[in-house]
Amino acid sequence: MANILKTIIENDKGEIRRLEKMADKVFKYEDQMAALTDDQLKAKTVEFKERYQNGESLDSLLYEAFAVVREGAKRVLGLFPYKVQVMGGIVLHHGDVPEMRTGEGKTLTATMPVYLNALSGKGVHVVTVNEYLSERDATEMGELYSWLGLSVGINLATKSPMEKKEAYECDITYSTNSEIGFDYLRDNMVVRAENMVQRPLNYALVDEVDSILIDEARTPLIVSGANAVETSQLYHMADHYVKSLNKDDYIIDVQSKTIGLSDSGIDRAESYFKLENLYDIENVALTHFIDNALRANYIMLLDIDYVVSEEQEILIVDQFTGRTMEGRRYSDGLHQAIEAKEGVPIQDETKTSASITYQNLFRMYKKLSGMTGTGKTEEEEFREIYNIRVIPIPTNRPVQRIDHSDLLYASIESKFKAVVEDVKARYQKGQPVLVGTVAVETSDYISKKLVAAGVPHEVLNAKNHYREAQIIMNAGQRGAVTIATNMAGRGTDIKLGEGVRELGGLCVIGTERHESRRIDNQLRGRSGRQGDPGESQFYLSLEDDLMKRFGSERLKGIFERLNMSEEAIESRMLTRQVEAAQKRVEGNNYDTRKQVLQYDDVMREQREIIYAQRYDVITADRDLAPEIQSMIKRTIERVVDGHARAKQDEKLEAILNFAKYNLLPEDSITMEDLSGLSDKAIKEELFQRSLKVYDSQVSKLRDEEAVKEFQKVLILRVVDNKWTDHIDALDQLRNAVGLRGYAQNNPVVEYQAEGFRMFNDMIGSIEFDVTRLMMKAQIHEQERPQAERHISTTATRNIAAHQASMPEDLDLSQIGRNELCPCGSGKKFKNCHGKRQ
């Protein structure tokens, strides 16, 4: 282990030396750029663009381009990037993460790689965690970019599609991570190319990259529509049952935060819901409601995991920032279960139309980089998942903050008593204090204690985050006391007021350790910016979540033997033990995120295929007849091959039914037409006849443009419907294969194999529906604005009719389980009408 650490440190030192040499080359242009007039300096942008278009690489332009930005920043912003900022900019251009401490000027650092990469004309996305930071940075740094001749756009959730498109067309676009993700998903749901807002994803520079790519990595962005099934009553019933349970009726795993019914709980469920066996296959849906009710009531905590707004809505609290996540809802029914628990209106369940995780969204960029002050602890994950390194950048001035050893108390009560005494003492001498908490509940509790102690203060948490920037900006003033959840105003510097340096600078007090060392380091990093003095102190108790999860029993015995109920233990060894516990949690969380990615990669591969084909259809300015006719041909082949092993009479009858109900006019084909033909000849006969029907169908449309429109909308509507169902099916499959792990099967391998088979089935089903709708749609001449509505409703009506289109006199008992269903769904019999037998 020591050798590994030594190697890592040596590699970092070597990288720093290399970056220093590159920064020196930038500095060599300093006098040359300073000698230019404003117009001459601005003209450099046009020169660089021309050189790039003529084949020169961005790497070769780096030194001059960075020098231009430095000089431009000095003239426009009154800021002149330091050497360490230039070094950080080089790391960003190379697609890595520079770890730069709080207050080292990351926003100014970003201007150099952003400018350089914008010269390509392919677009640069500067990604922030909230819209306040997007607007602030776009306004402040946009002044520099505009002066240098580059266009700057801000992409906000409130903007119209046209405004969004204009923002994305700019050389540099500022946006939040969630809005980029939702725009990507919505772009892949439109029917016309002109309604897409994004260009191909080129270069993303992510601010607070650890928050977005690590903390929110598992968060799926979901575009959804309403589910047709009414389920609110079931949520209320499950909630009522769960609230009636005793502690012996369920089992909670504190470490993994999972919960399940005990034997007595199962007995009570069977009695409550009047069931013989709770885990019978027909009760799968009910067990899902019960599982969610258990999680909602005994795992999810009010004012920690979520808050109830004044509008009686459940708002999720981000565990890493403490902010409420507006517009976000827990998936898979958990949100509705919490609504039932809290007695607020239950909103309709939704069906996912499109989804993507941040892991897969940002891996789609040609180049990805980001900035953070605390990335080294997650270097393995950055490297393994995103193929980017974390390079620690030296501070411009030495860090003077004093980080005290942790203080450990026996109880939460004695811990908070000590916190209040410490805050009061510092307040009385005028030293500003920032108290960091992990939950809204804790910040409210400390606030009440400080009020009782006569200490005026500000509270910053999920309930009043709209005042975040204002509160944080004043947190470094003399006598200021600020209580903040983990959000702690990331992105907003705390500047020290007059006379505060002499008092020791800002003191950061942590009220418990987070499960991630990185979050603790972020809190510490609020103090001691740019060489300022400062202090940090963490107060812990044996009753804290982290301590309970990892061995507080032994320490509890020490407190009892020494009779130290009100006193603290302080030692470096204790701090190391806590950090070792945090490493174990971080390792568990990383393993979980890695497994999520393995599952999500299955959907990623399938999504890329569907979206690529969809894009090809949307952007096609051609007759799509070859594509549709190929689908018709493959559909015919699947149906004929699917009945190859049946008896001749049964086979011909099934193929005839398929042709009548899905392919040709009912009275245009008879059994005699198919008798005596080989399977190959049947395929050819049906295909040739279908081509005539196809020509007849398109001849009813007004002109060539109407044909293209009809073809395009037809394909897209079928693809979108099938893809939505497929997403839902994959989600159900994922839940199902988890249980197969108990049978010694690898659930990920099972998911990959089954998901691949389901995808192929979906492709067949898409081609079947396109065939049937193309051949059976009742086409009328329509004006263009109405054409989309017409085909959409026709498709919906035909799909509904198709689901019931089984000939009444057909003997289903003679059909093999793996043969295609004769109803024409394109599914195997066992997965269609065979389910009902």
UniProtKB/Swiss-Prot annotation:
Zn(2+) binds at residues 821, 823, 832-833. Belongs to the SecA family. Part of the Sec protein translocase complex. Interacts with the SecYEG preprotein conducting channel. Has a central role in coupling the hydrolysis of ATP to the transfer of proteins into and across the cell membrane, serving as an ATP-driven molecular motor driving the stepwise translocation of polypeptide chains across the membrane. Its main location: membrane. Its cofactor is Zn(2+). May bind 1 zinc ion per subunit. It catalyses: ATP + H2O + cellular proteinSide 1 = ADP + phosphate + cellular proteinSide 2. The keyword NADP does not apply. Monomer and homodimer. Part of the essential Sec protein translocation apparatus which comprises SecA, SecYEG and auxiliary proteins SecDF. Other proteins may also be involved. This is Protein translocase subunit SecA 1.
